[in-house]
Amino acid sequence: MSSVFSGDETAPFFGFLGAASALIFSCMGAAYGTAKSGVGVASMGVMRPELVMKSIVPVVMAGVLGIYGLIIAVIISTGINPKAKPYYLFDGYAHLSSGLACGLAGLAAGMAIGIVGDAGVRANAQQPKLFVGMILILIFAEALALYGLIVGIILSSRAGQSRAD
């Protein structure tokens, strides 16, 4: 019996840390975006209640960010089964980087959506022509989270390709 530490005992920790970070950070972004743009909708709705349903778009877009984190967390957690097949440190680090890529991109997108949504719905109440511009900016902010989701899927697919030497 060798006393050399291979690191495989700690690899699932990094994998589950990646799953948790994907969900936690993306939900933090979703919560911030929902809260910030929701405050804008509520304050705008006092003066122009007929625009509330039209101005709910940033709140919905922010809520979608949590789903991206959930997708990556499920992909990662289904790939962690050290009893069925060997799970190396490479796999754990791949899953950790996957979760961080998706989670932090979701956090950044949520902050952008919240700030743009808050200012956008208030400005839309005063000048309705700004609605299309607000939607375009929100789409670009949402694309940040999509980039993180795509990179997260690519990185998590790299797990399981390592082999013991």
Swiss-Prot record:
Main location (coarse class): membrane
Instruction: Give me the Gene Ontology terms describing cellular component.
Output: membrane; proton-transporting V-type ATPase, V0 domain; vacuolar membrane
**Topology versus the membrane:** Multi-pass membrane protein
Write out the GO MF terms.
proton-transporting ATPase activity, rotational mechanism
Role this protein plays: Proton-conducting pore forming subunit of the membrane integral V0 complex of vacuolar ATPase. V-ATPase is responsible for acidifying a variety of intracellular compartments in eukaryotic cells.
Similarity section: Belongs to the V-ATPase proteolipid subunit family.
Protein name (record): V-type proton ATPase 16 kDa proteolipid subunit
Q: Which organism is it from?
A: Oryza sativa subsp. japonica (Rice)
